[in-house]
Each structure stands twice: as structure tokens, then as C-alpha cells.
A protein has these predicted regions:
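Residue-level recognition of single "structural anchor" positions
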Residues: 1-210
Length: 210
């Protein structure tokens, strides 16, 4: 499921925005395992969003007091996948546990129904799906966006609509006939009972008032 979309060039500020928004949307709950690629900004953004602020006590001595800082919370398990490339081709892949322990990573992977190793395959697959659904992002094409406003709008549309309108075969469940029935990410998360049409998704109020 796509939890957060922040269009634009990847920068440290955008990484912070993504992590903060994911924390907000999940109510601050720590995931069993967080994995990213080796982009350095994540190592500061993740404890910055989930961590506890520590204010150093005053010493009574002259000089500027030490600034408050964040520490990673207990239970945070975060690992990265680092790829080495030569001439644009991946020649080696290494993994590294940044927060938590190897045992905690192994325990999280042991509870997963789909992953047995630290990886970013879900994100990479989502990137491919995004390019397939949004022609503006296709490589080597004349359909690229000429106006950022339209590019941003279509990015939000296709990525968030994916949650409700895109049936995912691998997350399906067997029906009464024993056939696997594809589910949308929203169905798998218990947020919908059927695969929505684009018309349903576009006409559903963003906020429901009781």
C-alpha cells in the first residue's frame, strides 16, 4: 500500500517529509521492519520522526548550552540495501542493519509472508507499476510532463488510486471455488470490500461527516 506521496526530486527535505507523513498516517506506530536503499538522509530522518527528544541538562558553566537531540526509540528496526554500480550496472548488493539487531531483523522477516531477506523489491516493483500507470514517467517518450502542476496532480492521482483501484494478484485470497481472487491493497488492509472503479474513487468524499 502506498502510504505517502511527495513528488519531486529526492532531497533530504523530501525524505524528512515522507517519513514524517508516514509516521502521522500510521499513528506513530513503529513498523516491525523498515528498509530503504542507501540514501543517507534516511538515517537521520527516521529517528528524527520516531525518536525521543533529549534535552541535555545545564552544567552551570559558561558557554552555550548543548542543543536538544533525538535518539532512536527502543524497538526501532531499520536496515538498508546498498548497491554498487559500475557503468550503470549493479555489480554487488550489501545489506546493513542501522537500528536494532540482526536478531530483530530476522524475527521481523520470519513473520513476513513474502520476504525472507532485507530488500527493497516492493518499492522497486511499485516504481515499475507507477511508470506503467502514469505515462508521464515512462522512459524515452514524448509524453513527459511539460507543466509541473499537471505532473504533480497525476502523480497523486495514480499512486493513491492504486491503493483502491488496482487488483494485486499476489495479495489475493481463495474464493469458494478455490480460485485466487485478487485484492486491492485497500482490501488487504481492511479498508475496502471490493476493487473500486476510478469513478468510485474520484467521487468518494475525502472526508465523511457523520
Amino acid at each position: 500500500m502506498v502510504l505517502c506521496v511527495v513528488p519531486g526530486e529526492r532531497t533530504a527535505a523530501k525524505v524528512v517529509a515522507v517519513v514524517e507523513d508516514v509516521r502521522r498516517r500510521t499513528g506513530g506506530r513503529l513498523m516491525d521492519l523498515i528498509t530503504t536503499d542507501g540514501y543517507p538522509a534516511y538515517e537521520g530522518a527516521i529517528p528524527g520522526a520516531y525518536g525521543e527528544t533529549i534535552t541535555p541538562p545545564r552544567t552551570g558553566e559558561r558557554g552555550r548550552p548543548r542543543s536538544p537531540y533525538k535518539v532512536a526509540p527502543e524497538g526501532l528496526t531499520y536496515a538498508v540495501v546498498e548497491k554498487a554500480r559500475e557503468k550503470g550496472r549493479v555489480v554487488s548488493i550489501a545489506t546493513r542493519v542501522v537500528f536494532g539487531t540482526v536478531a530483530a531483523v530476522a524475527a521481523a522477516l520470519g513473520m513476513s509472508r513474502v520476504s525472507t531477506a532485507i530488500n527493497t523489491s516492493f518499492l522497486e516493483r511499485q516504481n515499475g507499476t507507477d511508470r506503467h500507470r502514469n505515462a508521464r514517467k515512462a522512459r524515452k517518450t514524448y509524453r513527459f510532463s511539460k507543466d509541473w502542476r499537471y505532473h504533480e496532480a497525476v502523480t497523486y492521482l495514480t499512486l493513491y488510486a492504486y491503493n483502491f483501484c488496482w487488483p494485486v494478484r499476489t495479495s489475493g485470497v481463495k474464493n469458494d471455488r478455490g480460485r485466487r481472487q485478487p485484492q486491492s491493497p485497500a482490501m488487504a488492509a481492511g479498508l475496502a470490500d471490493h476493487v473500486w472503479t476510478m469513478a468510485e474513487w474520484c467521487s468518494m468524499p475525502a472526508v465523511r461527516r457523520c
